[in-house]
């Protein structure tokens, strides 16, 4: 696959993920919240804190999509193994980890003030674990891109 074609497909995927995230945050989460509180008005106090939690947690996801867009642009310019991409991927790794920890800490705090269910905390452990795995994979990828950039630089100097 050529660089420009790869850039195009990456951008299409990033746009699709951004639109799906927008639908989830603007439509699905509020709708699910209303469905859950309809049978039990006692839990209606939990709706707004949960909605705010999800919206705040979505912001870092869009920052990561922006960083992915920047990486795609660099790939299109045939700068796949550049230090700029390393910085973007490393920053994305840190943001993923921060978002997972934020989500976990806020959920535990909400559980402590009785705005959350212990079962949600249990399910959240798996979500946080998946985020940590993705963060580690991104960190490893940034390390490999550094090595590839060094090799490419050495190759360019020897020719």
Describe these PLM feature segments:
Residues 19-33, 135:
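Alpha-helical transmembrane segments of multi-pass membrane proteins
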Residues 122-153:
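Alpha-helical transmembrane segments and their immediate juxtamembrane interface regions
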Residues 38-64:
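Membrane-helix boundary elements
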Residues 14-18, 90-100:
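Select subsegments of transmembrane alpha-helices in polytopic membrane proteins
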Residues 1-18:
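Alpha-helical transmembrane segments and their helix-start/interface "positive-inside/aromatic belt" motifs
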Residues 62-83:
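Membrane-helix interface/capping segments
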Residues 99-119:
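Alpha-helical transmembrane segments and their membrane-interface junctions
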Residues 40-43, 118-126:
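Non-cytosolic membrane-interface motifs at loop->transmembrane helix junctions
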């Amino acid at each position: 696959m050529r660089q420009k074609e790869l850039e195009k497909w990456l951008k299409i995927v990033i746009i699709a993920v951004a639109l799906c995230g927008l639908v989830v945050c603007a439509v699905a989460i509020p709708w699910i919240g209303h469905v859950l509180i309809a049978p039990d008005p006692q839990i209606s106090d939990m709706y707004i804190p949960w909605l705010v939690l999800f919206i705040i947690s979505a912001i870092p996801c869009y920052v990561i999509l922006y960083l992915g867009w920047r990486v795609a642009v660099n790939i299109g310019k045939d700068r796949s193994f550049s230090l700029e991409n390393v910085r973007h991927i490393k920053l994305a790794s840190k943001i993923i980890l921060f978002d997972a920890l934020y989500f976990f800490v806020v959920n535990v705090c909400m559980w402590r003030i009785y705005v959350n269910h212990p079962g949600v905390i249990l399910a959240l452990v798996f979500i946080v674990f998946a985020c940590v795995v993705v963060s580690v994979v991104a960190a490893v990828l940034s390390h490999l891109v550094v090595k590839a950039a060094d090799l490419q630089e050495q190759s360019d100097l020897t020719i």
